[in-house]
């Protein structure tokens, strides 16, 4: 009888780009010694669409529908960063009511993003029940978005100097009811998940990132705050009207997957606090700064020109970007979402550089999974929270 010889050489495994735990078209080339991970190389670019180059050939208003395809689970933040840059370059003041509406929409979008992180993350480590629970609350958030913007996703709601429309009648009461209901939902998650011994075995002490390590790798968002760094751009940069609300930065010291989970759960509760304060104190007034139209380029329509022939045609907005450069950033659900913008006195940006949080946070993955077990790759990758639309751009 021939006994097969035991092979001791390393095994290379491809995870993705169609693996259900890759959260998009991410491919990992994993080198294994049995169940132990020796090396891991992420392969990116499967969802690259040239978003930066497209921006340089569009006006800001024309480009707004494109930006919702970066992080398509938190589209309000990509819209906010797109209009914040021109507003700062042109020194445009946003009406107070518009600022409050923006904050409400941003925090609702943060909750929706964290919910759709929580469900697949739990499914990755073997807990199927929360996956169905989170869709129950997420549908309520999308109902609010649909009532206010007309779209469940890809809202196209932000405008330079304000928002596209005011809140409809009865929307504020509906949103307050959601806040009260959602607090009970989070309590249910904590009972079901946080003290579950099987869950704790899978996440506690897995994927530890130290404080210095997190700073050196340029991590941001929950990845940074779970490592003991109290850094939140809503407190640091004082954008929109976050300074007018009472809320706390959520952070943990341990730096493992459990700490990142606790930070995101805490952030959802803080978002509810911000939304409730904004809804109760929302001021009256306009929802858009009409003075932004003074930045439109004057047209001298020639005879037989397209815009001359069609008298009833509404002229397309051509907001001129001053000849300056600017870096603007917001605290997105996954971290620091930034744009480096250079204007050259034309309707198109001369340079539009995107700093996606998922792309930066993903770089530490090979370091975290080394010397871990194969099953821990899903736990660590899920705790990072990436969306390939913004990673590949």
Swiss-Prot record:
This is NAD(P)H-quinone oxidoreductase subunit H, chloroplastic. NDH shuttles electrons from NAD(P)H:plastoquinone, via FMN and iron-sulfur (Fe-S) centers, to quinones in the photosynthetic chain and possibly in a chloroplast respiratory chain. The immediate electron acceptor for the enzyme in this species is believed to be plastoquinone. Couples the redox reaction to proton translocation, and thus conserves the redox energy in a proton gradient. GO terms for molecular function: NAD binding; oxidoreductase activity, acting on NAD(P)H, quinone or similar compound as acceptor; quinone binding. One of its GO terms (cellular component) is chloroplast thylakoid membrane. Belongs to the complex I 49 kDa subunit family. It comes from Manihot esculenta (Cassava). InterPro entries: NADH_Q_OxRdtase_suD, NADH_UbQ_OxRdtase_49kDa_CS, NDH1_su_D/H, NiFe-Hase_large. Its EC number is 7.1.1.-. Keywords: Chloroplast, Membrane, NAD, NADP, Plastid, Plastoquinone, Quinone, Thylakoid, Translocase, Transport. NDH is composed of at least 16 different subunits, 5 of which are encoded in the nucleus. Signal peptide: none annotated. The keyword Chloroplast applies. Pfam families: Complex1_49kDa (PF00346). GO terms for biological process: photosynthesis, light reaction. Its main location: plastid. It catalyses: a plastoquinone + NADH + (n+1) H(+)(in) = a plastoquinol + NAD(+) + n H(+)(out); a plastoquinone + NADPH + (n+1) H(+)(in) = a plastoquinol + NADP(+) + n H(+)(out). It is found in: Plastid, Chloroplast thylakoid membrane. PANTHER family: NADH DEHYDROGENASE [UBIQUINONE] IRON-SULFUR PROTEIN 2, MITOCHONDRIAL, NADH-UBIQUINONE OXIDOREDUCTASE 49 KDA SUBUNIT. It is a peripheral membrane protein.
